[in-house]
Amino acid sequence: YLNRFESYLVSCADELYALVEQINHPYVEIMFDTFHANIEEVSTADAIRRIAKKTPHIQLSESTRGILGEGQVNWPSVLQAIKDVNYSGWLVVEAFSEKLPAAHIWRKMFNSERELVEKSYQFLITNYEKI
């Protein structure tokens, strides 16, 4: 789902889960994005726990759309929730760079894609192992 500033259909995990349940089709599931959840949810971790069974794809995105761990997302609780639900779907890092014109990025969030990948990966591995 998207946050309330980018969408009017649904803007939180519970609304999206209810919509997916109402559609009731095996090909309609949830793609969860921590950037939007960080705006809309009281607890991103609790939202993950509530919708996990209908969520085959989670986009891990920092509040700045930059390197994971360098913003305001509560990663320990998010990673704990992912572990708690025995999540086995896709975990994808989503970040925006100046190379994506449609994102209207006006400042650099990382120096290179390589830095983004290396630092975000190391952050995830290090912090997931702590749980």
Predicted features by range, described:
Residues 10-32, 37-131:
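Histidine-acidic metal/acid-base catalytic patches
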